[in-house]
């Protein structure tokens, strides 16, 4: 409530005093003779700085969200839960056009190695950016087995940060002729969260012709209803808005 970026002029369930009331803590007031519930000023500093730190002593000097750029485009990565030894990886690309494909190849025993999973056609224009939650358990298990793995996708992953480095919201997306569409199996992909780099080191990658995009289903399962939104939606880095 003391922050310069919080609006205090609000009415809450605690009364007319705005958010200031949320800085109070409840306690049993024995001095009243009835041990009634009362309120007092809460602690000014964190009681457990391993959980909540201060501005003067932050967990990270730069925060947990970083921008990655390179010849694949622009993406963001959450590194709060990624150990330093996993923040830099250079490994061959394996291409997936659906998150289920990764699980199938894992079950078939084809992913017991270092690789960068490149998951395409998951952007706002392609399919509305669904949550790619199925990727995390598989990649996390492979990392636990000692393999260097990472994710690059034009899709999204919401929620808490994972332990696997994941370059998400890559723009431009594959359906918008983004560079991710030109990535081929085995291309050496570098993801460097420390330096903010996302780069395909394959020789001649930038000059590669853009491959054709296969026709995607446009009717059935309500697709007709949302066709206008798919056509007009903006890029992920611009908010994926239709306005």
Model regions and ranges:
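Catalytic or ion-coupling anion/metal-binding cores of large enzyme and transporter domains
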Residues: 1-148, 152-173, 178-243
């Amino acid at each position: 409530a003391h922050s310069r970026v919080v609006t205090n002029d609000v009415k809450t369930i605690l009364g007319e005093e705005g958010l200031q009331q949320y800085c109070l803590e409840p306690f049993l007031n024995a001095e009243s003779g009835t041990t009634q519930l009362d309120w007092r000023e809460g602690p000014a500093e964190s009681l457990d700085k391993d959980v909540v730190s201060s501005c003067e002593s932050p967990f990270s000097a730069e925060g947990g969200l970083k921008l990655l750029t390179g010849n694949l485009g622009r993406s963001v990565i959450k590194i709060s839960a990624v150990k330093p030894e996993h923040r830099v990886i250079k490994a061959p690309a394996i291409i997936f056009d659906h998150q289920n494909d990764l699980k199938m190849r894992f079950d078939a025993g084809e992913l017991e190695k270092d690789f960068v999973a490149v998951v395409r056609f998951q952007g706002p224009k392609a399919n509305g950016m669904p949550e790619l939650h199925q990727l995390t358990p598989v990649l996390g298990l492979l990392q636990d087995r000692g393999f260097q793995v990472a994710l690059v996708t034009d899709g999204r992953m919401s929620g808490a940060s994972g332990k696997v480095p994941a370059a998400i919201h890559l723009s431009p997306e594959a359906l918008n002729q983004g560079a991710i569409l030109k990535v081929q199996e085995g291309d050496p992909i570098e993801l460097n969260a420390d330096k903010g780099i996302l780069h395909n080191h394959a020789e001649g990658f930038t000059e590669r012709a853009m491959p054709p995009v296969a026709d995607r289903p446009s009717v059935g399962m309500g697709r007709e209803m949302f066709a206008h939104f798919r056509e007009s939606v903006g890029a992920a880095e611009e908010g994926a808005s239709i306005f």
